[in-house]
From Swiss-Prot:
This protein's UniProt keywords: DNA replication, DNA-directed RNA polymerase, Magnesium, Manganese, Metal-binding, Nucleotidyltransferase, Primosome, Transcription, Transferase
PANTHER family with a match to the protein in the record: DNA PRIMASE SMALL SUBUNIT
Pfam families: DNA_primase_S
Organism, scientific name: Pyrobaculum aerophilum (strain ATCC 51768 / DSM 7523 / JCM 9630 / CIP 104966 / NBRC 100827 / IM2)
Origin organism lineage: Archaea, Thermoproteota, Thermoprotei, Thermoproteales, Thermoproteaceae
Gene Ontology MF terms in the entry: DNA-directed RNA polymerase activity; metal ion binding
Active site: D88, D90, D215
Cofactor names: Mg(2+); Mn(2+)
HAMAP family: DNA_primase_sml_arc
Root EC class: transferase
Descriptive protein name: DNA primase small subunit PriS
UniProt function note: Catalytic subunit of DNA primase, an RNA polymerase that catalyzes the synthesis of short RNA molecules used as primers for DNA polymerase during DNA replication. The small subunit contains the primase catalytic core and has DNA synthesis activity on its own. Binding to the large subunit stabilizes and modulates the activity, increasing the rate of DNA synthesis while decreasing the length of the DNA fragments, and conferring RNA synthesis capability. The DNA polymerase activity may enable DNA primase to also catalyze primer extension after primer synthesis. May also play a role in DNA repair.
Record-annotated disulphide pairs: none
GO biological processes: DNA replication, synthesis of primer
Amino acid sequence: MIVEVFFRNFYRNFAKFEIDAVDKREFAFQPFSGGMVRHKSFKSLEDLRKFVVEKTPRHIYHSAAYYERPGEEDMERKGWIGADLIFDIDGDHLDTEACRESKIVSLRCLEDAREEANKLIDVLIQELDLKPTRIVFSGNRGFHIHVSSEEVMKLGSRERRELVNYLKAVGFDPSRFIAKLGRRKVVLYEEEAVGNLLRIKQGVEDARAMKVEIDEVVTQDIHRLIRAPGSLNGKTGLVALPISLKELDKGVEYIVDKAIAFRKGHLKFKFEKPVEGPVLFEKVGGREGDVKVLPAYVAIYLELQEFGKIYD
């Protein structure tokens, strides 16, 4: 499979994984042939890289959790130490016009996801005093926000569920809130900190402004697997790209362009489904049965999305 050859070359020569405490993480891999290989562990990033070059999986994941024995197959015997707090913002979950109508990676939909990521980061920093450790473009339609700190590491599923409810404004009732003088906070009558005045004001005017659209299952699961930062997204061929807050603010065109892994060369592609419009900055038009020469990253994206096949 030509795409697999491109993936192997990337992992051999260009991949830069950004994963903390590798020796305490469980890793999982989805091969190009399908299925899932779980409960793998590695002593170092170099050991991980060697394995990936040899096996060349389509998807690479690691656990949000840290374990004493990450390679143990029995979850009860892994020895759970703690877990990062992970937030997943995905265009598939955003009820916006751009995301509803998007069948392929749309810059408009991704811009909606970027705005939601910025909203989440503002809430984490300003209201919860939690600083994101890593911001990652997923390589597809969204962003992953990682928080790694002692204060969140030991949170159980119940506490994480409560945090999800807060972020999604579950049960929000403006009449229950009062401003606390001398601070840019609002509190419950029970003196429980709940957020800054601007978001509460917006929430009173429009309940949707209070909500942060995260995938709640990802955040509350203390054993969750998340796409490995620096790996290739097997649905697109783009890099799951760690970015800074400044890079997030540069916009989605900058981010997607930086995430393109296969910039060199062209490939012959036979369409099995019609495509008309921009695909990763490239204007593409093809009907079923058409054969066209496309930039490598576009052809790889279209094959992974099952729009057709790359020809030798």
